[in-house]
């Protein structure tokens, strides 16, 4: 990015001249977007062309932009070419959206580089689970939590108006507005699906959308206290930035699908966290402080973004009595009594203390619902066979089931109670056995006897695997293994084989959502 800054001179140029618009006509911009070394690959396939980047298509697009030829006029008189028009329009959409996203990210990067001369790397903060140790240290003494689901992004033209505050390039903004009207619909921008064709462009609009909200939040927070924020840096959802400073923590994950934002106030009684379209504001204030924050936030969405804020998307409750749902965990503050025996001289006595502990639980009902949706069990949790995988080899089937089981255990290792995880393991193990028995037209009992303990070995976690190798005769009773909570700091990306379990009623629609799972093999 420093090379871009040298080639494009100063970042202030974007506010004085047409900075981005001329770059849209340069072929090397689209080559950089497609470069696997600079960014993750962007697929321009599945529309009848070769599955690779082609400069001929880019040249045709740039030629049309130079000549100002409207492609709808070209195909209007040819009914037999309407299908071709749809394919070419889809391809041009992918090219332009990638180019727009890449170029409009440059002002974000310049601001980041100007504010942070050196990016401090913290490997622990790369994990998407690093938010929970923060909660354990800071949330146990707090009283109230404001649980907020960020509303769906507004109309794209409203977002373009917000982008003008940090990109004063009239030509590129007009072209962006035309691009939204011609190629995109509001539904396609705010709805994410399995297709990733608009993912990067969606992140561009989503960043501007969330930054406006959090800037407003910071302004209100500074106005509410005599002491202003000690440190605040605006970072964005990109896969190359992750850092940590004294009072502000950011996490950026691979695939640009999630942002973990922790803001620690100078006032230790207030903490703010955001993850995947969900914000949590916890405070130790009185009964009047948190309702005021709730009122300010709701009015901001309605007056500034012209959005009707649903009251079900914001919830104010006490942490001790109402658990909150975050990152596929059910979290709450529990009071645990503890007895301490003290002895003074010859007299001994017991002291009873109540300690607050941050508990995290596995949402077993949504996970079973997701397993039922993926045809591993029914809605009651009874395992069934998966005939779709019957064509694979036996080792491949066992490996698939075992990988999903290990990933679930790996991700939910921080749970306070792991009994429900063994229920999930039972469902997957028996579903695997029934799938193999159906493939070989045998019974489950006979097939398990033929495989022996090697079948169970594939479903063991790393801790259980050590015990299995050390004490093979005692490997079937492993319920006491890993009773304590363990937060793994290697969960940083998506594993496509095990991301089905978050497709539950808690899924946030309309956001670039990271579907968490373990990357551990």
Curated annotation (Swiss-Prot):
It holds the Pfam family MatK_N. GO terms for biological process: mRNA processing; RNA splicing; tRNA processing. Keywords: mRNA processing, Plastid, RNA-binding, tRNA processing. Coiled coil: none annotated. GO terms for cellular component: chloroplast. One of its GO terms (molecular function) is RNA binding. It is found in: Plastid. Belongs to the intron maturase 2 family. MatK subfamily. Usually encoded in the trnK tRNA gene intron. Probably assists in splicing its own and other chloroplast group II introns. This is Maturase K. It comes from Cuscuta exaltata (Tall dodder).
